[in-house]
Amino acid sequence: MLFSQALGLPVITADDATTVGKVADLTVDAHDATVAAVRLSGAADRTEALPWSAVEAVGTDAVIVHSRVTAEQGQDRVPAHHRALGSRVLTEHGVEHGTVRDIAFDPVSGRILTLYTALGEIAGARLMGLGSYAAVVRAEPALTGAVGSP
């Protein structure tokens, strides 16, 4: 699933289909290359985010969460949020690699699969950090043993 597809989806509880809010954004844990939290808008209890562990399922029509998740349970386990979409992308050597256009993630595990940038695709496993200035990725390893070399 893509971040752009998840944005705006209703977030509902599993047991009684109560609407908790809408997906405003997804928080990335760059160290683990996973979605760490679902940022909410329009939540009646003013919950700002729910940890990914509270998510039961992500589909094309809604995000389903455990029914007993509360604001207090969620906030302690949610890392600082930095918007990933639109973020500048730099390698660990400072080489620019465009901006993040979208991100593919596994809707079950939350694992980041691919960053789609203005200059091409980057494997999620290469993500090293995400801050207010940029997303930092590992540079691609240099090719060795090129054709024609000894």
Regions found by a protein language model. Name each.
Residues 1-150:
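Peripheral interaction segments used for macromolecular assembly
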